[in-house]
Structures are given as structure tokens and as C-alpha cells.
């Protein structure tokens, strides 16, 4: 009933009493039961018990009665947190992560915890323990990851998701499933209460039906004191840079969908120009694995220590269920594959990259970068780490997402494939700190393209 209704409109109807919070909750629970095969939730017990009810204490809140679910590496008080790995079974969060606390204070209700790739170490959301997250827009195709469970639920009853993103874990699933995925400027929202991969790169994000909904949520979560320039003083349409390195090696379907979107933007007055980003691209490629793989082995145990779960550290590493994740982690535990000198060099270089990216925006007088979110379409056989055109599937997918993560840029993916086709995401990035400008401009582009409704006819 509420699948196509903008979030702001639905919130208004809840406040006016046109729609009841109980009705939304019941519809969401009904949809979860009907679509259990998509493995979107990690449940320890009854869904009815874990799906909160709207509290009268927050009835005046802007999101009162709106269900929000969280990736299962995000702490929600009194709910289990597994990070998708069996070794964390029995861990119950004693407090809320920052993003959870903020959404609860606005009146949102917790719908549960979403399935994910084990320990966030992958982009397919194949999970040996809790099942592979399904793709509601393209049944049988990969949902992406590591936050795949957050997108594997069709957008019924106003249900929204908050995942985390290290190198693309929000934006990859959004692109593969035909919805909007937003990663804020690194550090804009605190990552406290999130089981980490890398403190340098991790950020909480949003998965929403549309970019317009993401912009609405961003404004509520961040408030008015963001220090960002007013969007009203920025000229639209703006100048958009197309980084040449991120437009190469595309599948025909991806290339066609993304260039069609760019041409429509140009017809609407956007000045889209190709950029020579070769030096930046080469620098970024040296950073993809070094920092997260080095930081994980201190950040993850330290997080468990801070949560009082230090006794679980050995159990987690000993009981990793996914053979590919286990191989990676055990190889790094057995031997120092990344030296301290290499890690220090990578931190220095990530600082250089961030300076160079923001200088690029200024030098080229561009407001946004635009590029395909992924170079390949979602595979119909969901591989843990299979090979595509001679490169690992992981490397092929993450190559266009990791730049924004390393450069600390706000980034959003919006769907651009025609109805009935496999989903394709077009990515937009803005300079550091210009999150609201990014979201409002991308929402304007979304309206121009008319691609704001995910194609999930199979389930409705």
C-alpha cells in the first residue's frame, strides 16, 4: 500500500492519523513472512517480538512509526549482533550505535537486523550461516554486499534500512537491486557502535527507495547545523565531471544505461565533461586493500573489547563459516602480509588522495562527479569470489566504488536501467562536506530521469 509513497508524505500521514503505525508494522511483518526466502533478516527468535512498536514517548518525532532495520554489524540495544558470523552468537548489544540512537530519537521503530556478508568481507552477501540474501529486483541474481540483506526486502510499508559502508557495501547492493544508496562524507555521522572493518573508511549509510527519501532522512539525522553551504545558492544545472578511468571496461548494458542517463542530463542543461583522472585512479588502486586489511586486525578485536565481548575474539576467528573469508583472515593472522611501513605509507597516500580529489573539483569547476556504480551487471550465479573477465568478481565490482570511500567523499547511487532490465546504478560524488548539495542535486536528476521506482513486479 505504501510502497510508492514518498517518505516525507508518509510521515505526514502518520502525524495526521491518516495512516496508523500499527497498520504499517503489520504490513511489514506480513511481507517479511511472505518473502522469507530472500533471507533479508537475521532473527534470533520471533519476528513479532523483535519488531518494535511505535512509542507514545516519541509521537511528535518526524519519523514516528516508520520502521527501520539495521545491518547486523550495528548495535541495537537488547538485540543480538552477529556481524554475520557464527562466533558472535550470543552477543547482545547493551547500547545503541549512534545512527540507531538518532533514528530512535526521531520516533523510528526498529524492525530488526539484516543479513550480511560474513564480517563484511565480501560483496555478494553469500552467508553460510543465515543463507544468501536474495535480489528482489532480479530473482536469482546477486544482491551485492556486504549489506545485501538490507536490500533483499522489497520496499513495502515504509521500511527503511541503515547499513554500513567501507568500500562500497551500501552502494553496490543499491545498484544491483535498483534502489538508492547513500554514503555520507566520512566522519559526518559517527560510526560508534558499529562492528568495524576499518576506522579510516567505515561510515554508516542509508538505503532508500529514492534519493529524495535519502535527502529527507539526511536532513533529519544531520539537523540544520551541518556547516554546509546552502543548496539554494548553488546553480543548477551544474557542471558534472566524468572521470575517464571509471568509464572504461563497461558491460554493454551498463554503458548503454549510464550514457543514456548522461545524455538526458545534458538535454536538461547539465554540462557533462570528461576528466583525465589517471593519476588519481592509479593512486587509489594502491589503497583498496592495504588500509582495511591492516586496520581490521586491531579495530575488530578492540571493538569487541569495548563491548565486553573480548572472550569472543578467538571464537570468531576460529569459527568463520565462509571458506573464502576464513582463508583471507587466517592468512593474515598467520603472517604479516602487510607491513607497518606499508600501512603507514597507505595512510599518507590516502591523505594525498583526499587533497587531490577536492582540488580536482575546484580546478575543473565541477559540482559533481558521475560514473557507473559498477562496470559489470549482477551475475545470475552468485559467486563468493568467482572470476569475471580474468579479474576476481570482488575486484571487478569494487573498482568503481572505492574511490569515494578512500577520498572521504559523499556518494550516492541511483538506478538508471530501463523498466524490466537488470538494475544499473549511476553514481554521483560531491566534494567533502557537501552531502546535502549532493543529495538534493541527485534527487533533481532522479526526477529528470524518471527512474526512481525499483522494478520489483515479480513480488507484487
Curated annotation (Swiss-Prot):
<comment type="function">
    <text>Hydrolyzes indole-3-acetamide (IAM) into indole-3-acetic acid (IAA).</text>
</comment>
<dbReference type="GO" id="GO:0009851">
    <property type="term" value="P:auxin biosynthetic process"/>
</dbReference>
<comment type="pathway">
    <text>Plant hormone metabolism; auxin biosynthesis.</text>
</comment>
<feature type="active site" description="Charge relay system">
    <location>
        <position position="146"/>
    </location>
</feature>
<dbReference type="GO" id="GO:0016787">
    <property type="term" value="F:hydrolase activity"/>
</dbReference>
<comment type="similarity">
    <text>Belongs to the amidase family.</text>
</comment>
<dbReference type="InterPro" id="IPR000120">
    <property type="entry name" value="Amidase"/>
</dbReference>
<dbReference type="InterPro" id="IPR036928">
    <property type="entry name" value="AS_sf"/>
</dbReference>
<dbReference type="Pfam" id="PF01425">
    <property type="entry name" value="Amidase"/>
</dbReference>
<keyword id="KW-0073">Auxin biosynthesis</keyword>
<feature type="active site" description="Charge relay system">
    <location>
        <position position="71"/>
    </location>
</feature>
<dbReference type="InterPro" id="IPR023631">
    <property type="entry name" value="Amidase_dom"/>
</dbReference>
<protein>
    <recommendedName>
        <fullName>Indoleacetamide hydrolase</fullName>
        <ecNumber>3.5.1.-</ecNumber>
    </recommendedName>
</protein>
<feature type="active site" description="Acyl-ester intermediate">
    <location>
        <position position="169"/>
    </location>
</feature>
<keyword id="KW-0378">Hydrolase</keyword>
